[in-house]
Amino acid sequence: AMEFLPQQNKVNAGDKLKGQLRAEGKNVIVIGGGDTGSDCVGTSNRHGAVSVTQFEVMPQPPEEENRPMTWPYWPIKLRTSSSHDEGCEREFAISTKEFIGEKGKVTGLKTVRVEFKDGKLVEIPGTEVVMKADLVLLAMGFVSPVAAVLDAFGIDKDARGNAKATVDFTGGYATNVPKVFAAGDIRRGQSLVVWAIREGRQAARAVDEFLMGYSDLPR
């Protein structure tokens, strides 16, 4: 997705790209059920894909949320975007076990159905299936930053493996290592780009204050 979608954005802006990753005439599988996955679905359809299938490892949510149980939590319900309306098969509670290919090109995915047991997703025996794919787009989130990067600096991590950093206005985004700051996904975990932009600006102010003793940058 990180190659597929930006390339299309450039084309939409009028750029001419050589070797653009295209979905036309292909059986496309999108791994990931979030917004990025939906964007991949819509773009693949507009390219002229033969088929588009979207994988989500979590079970299919209900079409309507349980209203009394919602607030203050994010309502859990099936969300259908305009990209889905363009056409795609949505597979829930499915996990990819293996990429299958010939001569360096993907030809399919070996998949298995999963379910929750004791709070963990486990494979359901006897449900392995190979699904045809000419193009596989990865639109998953991530669990935590690459540990080797944080370990190389000696940065403390939280329970989820993210960098620990303060978030107050004085010394904000400072880690336990002097002169090392952390902001965005590496600190808060997988999130939206608007959060990364916000924290990046706040961290820039914190670094400016650290270096200059004051800052005129906005909070």
Language-model features, listed with the residues they occupy:
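Residues forming the flavin
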Residues: 1-219
